[in-house]
């Protein structure tokens, strides 16, 4: 019994942030925290952004495009982690996210900000699955539950802290600093991961389901476009509204049929 307790204590000590693998876990948590906070941090900054850039009718896209780009790119990058390794994809994801943050910070119009938010979302789509894969690689099955608790706490804290941080930046600095603050933090996470994390890549043969990715991306985009702009740019019962929503729904149905037919599924492991 005493030996079992001692083993549990050693196991707990080996998965903490102060352990040998702690810097890698810290980098993963920081990366995940950045993409999680950016999903909510704009909530309290919207009035200031609209006041500077205009485009009040388009501001919902700041949230939708980020989540859409992330959702579409997650399965793609998850496949690439098996092709070229976790470390390159994680660094690419952080790089895309940081580049998108810089461009968001210097955005000159609402359409430009929306486009750059999509770039952020692509980076987030690489970070999210790769972070969990790295954890699975460096921790045993017995250790993963505790480590996943660390990562889950990041998501929970980010949901609460995000809007608060957005309000602080708007009140005391400028809404652009919501994005600029990601640059040094993302750079530090990438540097730490580059130095501390090493892997032996075992290349596996995977076919990237481009057809599924296109159908999902275009179909979901059209549905979101129809829902966001319906009643604003066109009436709900107008031809554009019905056509956009119908085409989007048909593409999503086609996506479902394609995935049933494929041997290598876009949303599969």
What are these language model-derived features?
Residues 171-269:
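Hydrophobic transmembrane-helix bundles of small-molecule transporters
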Residues 2-195:
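Transmembrane-helix bundle of Major Facilitator Superfamily
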């Amino acid at each position: 019994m005493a030996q079992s307790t001692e083993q549990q204590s050693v196991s707990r000590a080996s998965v903490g942030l102060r352990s040998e693998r702690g810097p890698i876990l810290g980098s993963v948590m920081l990366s995940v925290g950045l993409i999680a906070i950016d999903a909510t941090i704009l909530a309290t900054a919207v009035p200031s952004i609209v006041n500077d850039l205009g485009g009040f009718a388009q501001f919902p896209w700041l949230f939708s495009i980020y989540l859409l780009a992330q959702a579409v790119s997650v399965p793609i990058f998850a496949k690439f982690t098996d092709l070229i390794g976790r470390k390159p994809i994680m660094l690419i994801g952080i790089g895309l996210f940081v580049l998108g943050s810089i461009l968001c910070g210097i955005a000159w119009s609402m359409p430009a900000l929306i486009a750059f938010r999509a770039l952020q979302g692509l980076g987030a789509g690489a970070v999210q699955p790769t972070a969990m894969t790295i954890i699975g690689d460096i921790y045993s099955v017995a250790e993963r539950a505790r480590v996943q608790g660390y990562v889950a706490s990041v998501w929970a804290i980010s949901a609460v802290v995000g809007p608060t941080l957005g309000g602080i930046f708007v009140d005391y600095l400028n809404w652009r600093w919501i994005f600029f603050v990601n640059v040094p933090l993302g750079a530090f996470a990438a540097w730490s991961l580059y130095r501390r994390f090493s892997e032996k890549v075992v290349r596996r043969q995977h076919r990237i389901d481009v057809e599924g990715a296109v159908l999902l991306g275009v179909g979901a985009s059209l549905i979101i476009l129809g829902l966001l702009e319906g009643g604003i740019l066109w009436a709900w019962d107008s031809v554009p509204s019905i056509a956009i929503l119908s085409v989007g729904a048909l593409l999503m149905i086609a996506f479902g049929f394609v995935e049933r037919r494929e041997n290598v599924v876009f949303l599969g492991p």
